[in-house]
Amino acid sequence: MAFMLKRVSLLSAIALVASTLGLSTSPVQSQATGTIRIDGSSTVYPITEAVAEEFQKRGGGRATVGVSGTGGGFKKFCRGQTDISNASRPILATEIAACRAAGVQFIELPVAYDALTVVVNRQNPVSNLTTAELKKMWEPAAQGRVSKWNQASGRLQNAPLRLYGPGPDSGTFDYFTEAIVGKSKSSRRDYTPSENDNVLVQGVARDKNALAYFGYAYYRANTNRLKAVAINGVLPSAQTVRNNRYRPLSRPVFIYVNAKSLQRPEVKRFTDYYMNNASRLSGAVGYIGLPARAYTLAKQHLQKRKIGTVFAGDAPVGLTIEALLKREAQY
């Protein structure tokens, strides 16, 4: 079953369970007056879409959630075309400069942790790859040269290697290339790219020789068709992210809120609702909720309208949950 169909069923189940257990899903207090415009990361999309659906069902108003990749989302955000930008990496220095030039101020809010997941077809014999083997598959020098699995490592099968991955506007592309190749956006180009992670899922599900990488939630929704590959002997999971073993492919994900948009009551209500329910909904759609302390700090930053980013235009690789908390507390 496709991810989107699973997500719709899942959200219905979330509402039922939350109602039964008395979780924080109380109706938003008043009807919104305008549409909340959101765009950006496909990785963060499932969380934000889950929030938007609940928010609308509880009378908060309408929020539209688009997908154009983290980089594509920031382009719109810094032009003032969206109220909130989903991001699977921190905002970069060039994007900060673009926002500043357009007079767009923003508040940075971490919402969850992701285990960026490398997947293969369930019929593929590969169960573990090293970061060095991944680099040999994906580095620019591999283009036109590494077309079989055993060309990346002699221990792998003599079979065609077909690669799927996010496009260059994706924050996942930025993060993966930095973590695996050693330089952001440094990648071979002879692979099948898409900003729609469901396209990547379909590609691998139909081809026993394919490999792809994307956010953990998309793997979790398709475990009957895909197999996660252990990286340096460690499989992605909530546990291996929390104990810092799944490195370097674990990372925080964010939303960025236009400070001017927060003056609109419906945007303020939506953002408050998001932060009050991010832990529950991020876990429900397949990501790893942050510690309660992280959400408390984020809510304080939101309440105080703390403008800017704790990352100073950099996108660090392998940032632990503890390191994220330290940055947030010192900001």
Predicted feature residues:
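C-terminal segment of classical bacterial N-terminal signal peptides
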Residues: A18-P27
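Extended interaction regions within the primary functional domain
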Residues: M1-A2, L21-G22, V44
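Flexible loop/hinge segments at secondary-structure junctions
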Residues: S26-Y331
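Bacterial N-terminal signal peptides that target proteins for export
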Residues: A2-I14
